Structure formats: C-alpha cells, structure tokens
Amino acid sequence: MGDPNSRKKQALNRLRAQLRKKKESLADQFDFKMYIAFVFKEKKKKSALFEVSEVIPVMTNNYEENILKGVRDSSYSLESSLELLQKDVVQLHAPRYQSMRRDVIGCTQEMDFILWPRNDIEKIVCLLFSRWKESDEPFRPVQAKFEFHHGDYEKQFLHVLSRKDKTGIVVNNPNQSVFLFIDRQHLQTPKNKATIFKLCSICLYLPQEQLTHWAVGTIEDHLRPYMPE
C-alpha cells in the first residue's frame, strides 16, 4: 500500500491538471465562509465581528494590474509581487458583510467601515472556513493566518495622502495575505477639509496548496474570542 499523503497529493495534482484544462481553479471546488473581526486596543471593548455574505474566489492574474500598481506606488516591492504572481494563488474576495451583533438582524450591506483617521483599532483579523462543494460536512477552519495591524495600514494611508487617487487604492499587510480596497472621502468641517479612508472590500490571498490544510475546531470555537455580547 502507498503512503496516504502521497496518494492524496497525487489525487490533488490530477485534479489541478484537469482544472487547468478547464481554466478553473481548485478554489472553485470549495464553498467558503469568511468572518472579519475589527479588534480594538481597549481590551474591555468587544471586537466588531462581521460575516461575509458571499466569498468570491478569483485567480491571481485577474488582479495583476492592481498588484503592479502597488509596486509603482512603492506600497510593496517588485520582487515580492512577482513572487506572488508566479505562485498558484487564489484570491478570496469579500465585497459585502453583515454584523454578528444580535440586535442587528438580516442587514447585509456593502462594506463601509472607517479605518482612518482613528486610533482605537489594534488589528483586522479574517477567519476563513471551507468545505468541498456539495458536501454535507461542516465547514472547517483553513490553517492560515490573516491579520493586518493598524500600524501597517496607517503607514500606507499616510503615503497615499500625498497622492490624488480617490478610488483604486489598495493596501496590504506585510506578508501579502490581506488586501484592503479603500475609498478616499473628504469631509468639510467648520475649520478645514478632512480626509477619511473607508474600507470597501477585502481580498485574502491563499496559495492553492493550502486549500486542503484544515485546522481543528468548529466555526463557533474560532469565533468565540471575537463574538459580541
């Protein structure tokens, strides 16, 4: 008998080859659930937790232009971006979400969350779960870390302030696993015009080989630290 891990790898390789012929990605064979937690610096303050209403898998080269634009704007290096584009990477796009608070029921909306200027957020955490399509099995946690700390995105916002882009602003965490799509808006105050940056969608980058790397535990187990009262 062959090694089970070896057999599994061979099966996945065969599936990848078939999918390439069909111009599909391995991610199309999965259902996904994603949750977004805005974790506050004040530990007594509960995280703001949202469930993504639909997770849309997209192959990396669809956003090649955005990645290379980030290089031109010095948001990240050419070397790391080329490495990202050459990998077999899936994007998991999250354009809409709904609050997990019990007093906000059935309200799905476009993402609209002010990220700057504000200093109360410690980090953004995305939790990803998946299962094979048409499966009755429960969703399992994907074994990957998706975090974006306030200091990392604030530095990029300060860099963007000197430019005139209103839309098409994309910032990413240091290991390029979380990309935030941002809208710049201006508010007129009695004294001056203030610039704010709002989150309008999130994209997670995950190597295809990690799609079948699951951790233990249920959705409830992993959401518990972030759940509102």
Swiss-Prot record:
This is Uncharacterized protein C6orf62. Pfam families: DUF4566. InterPro entries: DUF4566. PANTHER family: BA1-643 (PTHR28336), SIMILAR TO CDNA SEQUENCE BC005537 (PTHR28336:SF1). The gene is C6orf62.
